[in-house]
Amino acid sequence: MAKAPASNAAQRVRKKVRKNVADGIAHVHASFNNTIITITDRQGNALSWASSGGQGFKGSRKSTPFAAQVASEVAGRAAIEQGVKNLDVEIKGPGPGRESSVRALAALGIRINMIADVTPVPHNGCRPQKRRRI
């Protein structure tokens, strides 16, 4: 016969550690379908993250600039709670949420030091997929 699950003594809930990080990096991954914002410290340890799909936007609404704005506001507020005051922004991808996510972070009162486009560009590497015909 199977044992009954143990009570609360066996379950451990990890308390969120509040770091005090003044400077960070905001990684914005803007694809055509979604926008993911991750805010890290200088070493690359994630402090907070949010995505358009995680904020309740589904389907084609995920890929809108407004969805990216909402996601970056959520990630930015969580980073401010961790003590972040200055951010470098690294944008990757061609999606529609590129600019609106940076504007939303600036509107929260976070000082933006630098904006860099780190979209990977091939030096004629792999052959691209065939052209879509509708």
UniProtKB/Swiss-Prot annotation:
One of the record's GO molecular function terms: rRNA binding
Coiled-coil regions listed in the entry: none
PROSITE patterns reported for this sequence: RIBOSOMAL_S11
Keyword tags: Ribonucleoprotein, Ribosomal protein, RNA-binding, rRNA-binding
Pfam families: Ribosomal_S11
Protein's GO biological process: translation
InterPro entries in UniProt: Ribosomal_uS11, Ribosomal_uS11_bac-type, Ribosomal_uS11_CS, Ribosomal_uS11_sf
GO CC, alphabetical: ribonucleoprotein complex; ribosome
rRNA-binding listed as a keyword: yes
UniProt signal peptide: none
Source organism superkingdom: Bacteria
Record-linked PANTHER family: 40S RIBOSOMAL PROTEIN S14/30S RIBOSOMAL PROTEIN S11
HAMAP family (alphabetical): Ribosomal_uS11 (MF_01310)
Subunit text: Part of the 30S ribosomal subunit. Interacts with proteins S7 and S18. Binds to IF-3.
Listed NCBIfam families: PRK05309.1, uS11_bact
Free-text function comment from the UniProt entry: Located on the platform of the 30S subunit, it bridges several disparate RNA helices of the 16S rRNA. Forms part of the Shine-Dalgarno cleft in the 70S ribosome.
Family, per entry: Belongs to the universal ribosomal protein uS11 family.
Name this protein carries in UniProt: Small ribosomal subunit protein uS11
Gene name tied to this protein: rpsK
